Swiss-Prot record:
Domain of life where this protein originates: Eukaryota
Keyword Repeat: yes
Function as written in the Swiss-Prot or TrEMBL entry: Scaffold component of the nucleolar structure. Required for localization of DDX21 and NCL to the granular compartment of the nucleolus. Part of the small subunit (SSU) processome, first precursor of the small eukaryotic ribosomal subunit. During the assembly of the SSU processome in the nucleolus, many ribosome biogenesis factors, an RNA chaperone and ribosomal proteins associate with the nascent pre-rRNA and work in concert to generate RNA folding, modifications, rearrangements and cleavage as well as targeted degradation of pre-ribosomal RNA by the RNA exosome.
Compositional bias ranges of the Basic residues kind: 14-26, 112-130
Start and end residues of each stretch annotated as Disordered: 1-134, 539-612
UniProt protein name: WD repeat-containing protein 46
Organism: Canis lupus familiaris (Dog)
Length: 612
């Protein structure tokens, strides 16, 4: 039997030969000790140990996660507060980040989202309460910084229309705007010729994707106005006075000649509310799920569409009601009357919350902006007025129009549209927080028929016009808010997302009893009720449990509890309390002197109303 000869000393085994041919992998953090020759392939030198000093060293102050005994269960180390502002960590390549940490936030941007006034000092309270207040303030500051940082993601900007040198934008026609914009925006301008069923009232859905319109001769239709896809089209064979979408585009209400009807997006009648008869105007409150109706009989009715019950039926005692709008800020209903007044209503009160004398004649139209700050009214005296709703409801500006405005509408960014006969004028202010300037119109458009309805489309620079000749979609640059909240009103939501949103909205429904002029008052402390409860408690117990107990010195030993020492200690405490009272009175004296130094105003005279 022959045996294979063993390899000699000079002959290497096959396995050893393969190992010598294999090159060591070169890491990208390793640096060459010497420059390689031209054309030579770079690589680590042979038969030399790897230089370990070139590898990045792990910082010593980093807490590594401990290995879990349970397989597959990740553990996340908690970062101590002291290590938040450490020096920037090195990358694997050993280079430092030239811009370590998050990008700085400008103070002006962070102040816009801040809800805590840092200028006010924290009250002197217990240490535990003070620590809680400090933690809450730190959390609010972090939230405001995150909100300011996320604002950078809102890349959309509002549009605008700017003329050339000295050019009046009111003279720019819609055809010129359509030629200047892109194809997608140009498709949003269209006309529907529906003369045989007019005049028309129209309304956009809350997300701004769908359009519902109803003609005076019974024609009712809804469509996706972006894609021009018709959802339903019916003829109710009865006069249609107003139409409104409910909380979504799946339901809409129609005020017909006799009763109020509710339809779905396929045109099927779901409900007929006979208690709401001879309705002239409709308004929907989305956060309360309330449908407000104004009728010829002078009643303002609130219908809860989530349970199908009448919440309140209020008699305005002002005759026929055909002028109504809502305040989006506090959900208060504004009614215009024939005596020139505008009344503000809430379902929790049987009497109006306030009455404003706006015109010498009857009120023809009322509109409130999205912030609830300004109200626009027009009357039979051909006056168009802007009122401030924050204080004493004083008029800010007024303008006499050649023809009285019969319809008014505010956009999301504060533009005011007024329909006068067959002409539509649009005014714009200096900014979103300023009222619209009535001196010079921003845009003007003439229609083929008399205007009977105005509504700005949410999140689109489009104004919907309903007139005797049909429907017109007008382009208004800078009218809408460019960025929308995807969790609140998402124009691109699917059917499942809409269903989930409906469930959440129903769970978060605001009760009708909470509608008031100032919604911030709900978060304030009811001092009157608190004092009344405290008084009743004192009468019931016979003493005040919260009153400060009189000072009782503690007994001491070794003769220090004698009568003289006890009296001395009581007197010392009384002197301290007296000094505190004197100090407080001295601090209040300068304020009283300043009030006395102010000159008293003269008594008002009956002739002051003639002074301009």
């Amino acid at each position: 039997m022959e045996t294979a000869s063993k390899p000699g000393r000079d002959v290497q085994p096959k396995k050893a030969r393969l190992q010598t041919k294999k090159k060591k992998p070169r890491r990208y953090w390793e640096k060459e000790a010497t420059l390689t020759a031209a054309g030579a392939s770079p690589g680590p030198p042979r038969n030399k140990k790897r230089n370990r000093e070139l590898r990045p060293q792990r910082p010593k102050n980093i807490n590594l996660p401990k290995k879990s005994r349970i397989p597959g269960k990740p553990q996340f180390p908690k970062k101590p507060r002291e290590q938040r502002n450490l020096e920037p960590q090195r990358n694997l390549s050993g280079a430092q980040d030239p811009f370590p940490g998050p990008a700085p936030i400008p103070e002006e941007v962070a102040r816009k989202f801040r809800r805590i006034d840092k200028s006010k000092k924290l009250p002197h309270s217990k240490s535990k309460t003070r620590s809680r207040l400090e933690v809450a303030e730190a959390e609010e500051e972090e939230i405001s910084i995150k909100a300011a940082r996320s604002e950078l993601l809102l890349a959309e900007e509002p549009g605008f229309l700017e003329g050339e040198d000295g050019e009046d934008t009111a003279k720019i026609r819609q055809a010129e705007i359509v030629e200047a914009v892109d194809i997608a925006s140009a498709a949003k301008h269209f006309d529907l010729n529906l003369r045989q069923f007019g005049p028309y009232r129209l309304n956009y859905s809350p997300v701004g994707r769908h359009l519902a319109f109803g003609g005076h001769r019974g024609h009712v239709a809804t469509l996706d106005w972006v894609t021009k896809r018709l959802m339903c089209e019916i003829n109710v064979m009865e006069a249609v006075r107003d139409i409104r979408f409910l909380h979504s585009e799946a339901l809409f209400a129609v005020a017909q000649n006799r009763w109020l009807h509710i339809y779905d997006n396929q045109g099927i009648e779901l409900h007929c509310i006979r208690r709401c008869d001879r309705v002239t105007r409709l308004e929907f409150l989305p956060f309360h799920f309330l449908l407000a109706t104004a009728s010829e009989t002078g009643f303002l009715t609130y219908l809860d569409v989530s349970v199908g019950k009448i919440v309140a039926a209020l008699n305005a005692r002002a005759g026929r009601l055909d002028v109504m709008t809502k305040n989006p800020y506090n959900a208060v209903i504004h009614l215009g009357h024939s005596n020139g007044t505008v009344s503000l209503w809430s379902p929790a009160m049987k009497e109006p919350l306030a009455k404003i004398l706006c015109h010498r004649g009857g009120v023809r139209a009322v509109a409130v902006d999205s912030t609830g700050t300004y109200m626009a009214t027009s009357g039979l005296d051909h006056q168009l007025k802007i009122f401030d709703l924050r204080g004493m409801f004083q008029p800010l500006s007024a303008r006499t129009l050649p023809q009285g405005a019969g319809h008014l509408a505010f956009s999301q960014r504060g533009l005011l549209a007024a329909g006068m006969s067959d002409v539509v004028n649009i005014w714009m202010g200096q900014g979103m927080a300023s009222p619209p300037s009535l001196e010079q119109p921003y845009l003007t458009h003439r229609l083929s028929g008399h205007v009977h309805g105005l509504h700005f489309c949410p999140f689109e620079d489009v104004l919907g016009l309903g007139h005797s000749g049909g429907i017109t979609s007008m382009l208004v640059p800078g009218a809408a808010e460019p960025n929308f909240d995807g969790l609140e009103n998402n124009p691109y939501r699917s059917q499942k997302q809409r269903q989930e949103w409906e469930v959440k909205a129903l769970l978060e429904k605001v009760p009708a009893e909470l509608i008031c002029l100032d919604p911030r008052a709900l978060a304030e402390v009811d001092v009157i009720s608190l004092e009344q409860e405290k008084k009743e408690r004192i009468e019931r117990l016979g003493y005040d449990p919260e009153a400060k107990a009189p000072f009782q010195p503690k007994p001491k030993q070794k003769g220090r509890s004698s009568t003289a020492s006890l009296v001395k200690r009581r007197r010392k405490v009384m002197d301290k309390e007296h000094r505190d009272k004197v100090r407080q009175s001295l601090e209040q004296q300068p304020q009283k002197q300043e009030k006395k130094a102010k000159p008293l105003k003269a008594r008002p005279s009956a002739l002051d109303r003639f002074v301009r």
